[in-house]
């Protein structure tokens, strides 16, 4: 597979069906949980720590599913969906660099919300800056992330962690 520096929506859907990085490799969720429409930049260099970065975008539409239910009469995109998008991008990057296994979010150090995403907004931009990538028997990415809406940064997340697991059940057993 040739690594690309950007991906359109149809290519991201291939990832959701396990056909972008091959069988047994990280997958993105299918719509409606896929929280971006395109990845505009991927690199193993760059970002705030010069250890890799990902930039992605979501086009907003007042008819998106979450605006209809969160909250009736006061629609706002749930902050947890923006956070999940950041984890999705960390996992996608791990597959992009050749990591294998099923991606699982492992946590984050700190999340701050300083704004909200409303139906009248046009575009959400997600940015990931990698701090550390382990690509051995354990595959794990640690990154900081930012969410902006129409050019204004409104969320920050520090120390996002995603791991790739050959058997995701191992994660449950190790915590029980």
From Swiss-Prot:
The residue ranges crossing the membrane are none
Q: Does the keyword Isomerase apply?
A: yes
The molecular function terms in GO held by this entry are:
(3R)-hydroxyacyl-[acyl-carrier-protein] dehydratase activity; trans-2-decenoyl-acyl-carrier-protein isomerase activity
Q: Where is this protein localized, as stated in its record?
A: Cytoplasm
Under catalytic activity, the entry for this protein gives:
a (3R)-hydroxyacyl-[ACP] = a (2E)-enoyl-[ACP] + H2O; (3R)-hydroxydecanoyl-[ACP] = (2E)-decenoyl-[ACP] + H2O; (2E)-decenoyl-[ACP] = (3Z)-decenoyl-[ACP]
Query: Does the record bear Nucleus in its keywords?
Result: no
- What biological-process GO terms show up in the record? unsaturated fatty acid biosynthetic process
What InterPro entries does the entry give?
FabA, FabA_FabZ, HotDog_dom_sf
Q: What is its EC number?
A: 4.2.1.59, 5.3.3.14
Catalytic residues, per the record, are: 70
Q: Which family does the record assign? A: Belongs to the thioester dehydratase family. FabA subfamily.
Assembly, in brief, is:
Homodimer.
Name the job this protein performs: Necessary for the introduction of cis unsaturation into fatty acids. Catalyzes the dehydration of (3R)-3-hydroxydecanoyl-ACP to E-(2)-decenoyl-ACP and then its isomerization to Z-(3)-decenoyl-ACP. Can catalyze the dehydratase reaction for beta-hydroxyacyl-ACPs with saturated chain lengths up to 16:0, being most active on intermediate chain length.
* PANTHER family tied to this protein: 3-HYDROXYACYL-[ACYL-CARRIER-PROTEIN] DEHYDRATASE, 3-HYDROXYDECANOYL-[ACYL-CARRIER-PROTEIN] DEHYDRATASE
Query: What name is this protein filed under?
Result: 3-hydroxydecanoyl-[acyl-carrier-protein] dehydratase
- What's the source species for this entry? Alkalilimnicola ehrlichii (strain ATCC BAA-1101 / DSM 17681 / MLHE-1)
Q: What is the lineage of its organism?
A: Bacteria, Pseudomonadati, Pseudomonadota, Gammaproteobacteria, Chromatiales
Q: Which gene encodes it?
A: fabA
């Amino acid at each position: 597979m040739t690594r690309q520096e950007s991906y359109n929506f149809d290519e991201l859907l291939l990832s959701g069906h396990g056909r972008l990085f091959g069988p047994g490799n990280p997958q993105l969720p299918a719509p409606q949980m896929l929280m971006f429409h395109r990845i505009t930049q991927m690199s193993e260099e760059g970002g705030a720590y010069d250890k890799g970065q990902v930039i992605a975008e979501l086009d907003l539409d007042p008819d998106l599913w979450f605006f209809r239910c969160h909250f009736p009469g006061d629609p706002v995109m749930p902050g947890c969906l923006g956070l999940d998008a950041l984890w999705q991008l960390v996992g996608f990057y791990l597959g992009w660099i050749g990591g294998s296994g099923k991606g699982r979010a492992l946590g984050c150090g700190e999340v701050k919300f300083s704004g909200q995403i409303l139906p009248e907004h046009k575009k959400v931009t997600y940015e990931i800056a990698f701090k550390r990538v382990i690509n051995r028997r354990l595959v794990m990415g640690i990154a900081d992330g930012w969410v902006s809406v129409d050019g204004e940064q409104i969320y920050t997340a520090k120390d996002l962690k995603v791991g790739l697991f050959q058997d995701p059940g191992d994660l449950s057993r190790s915590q029980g």
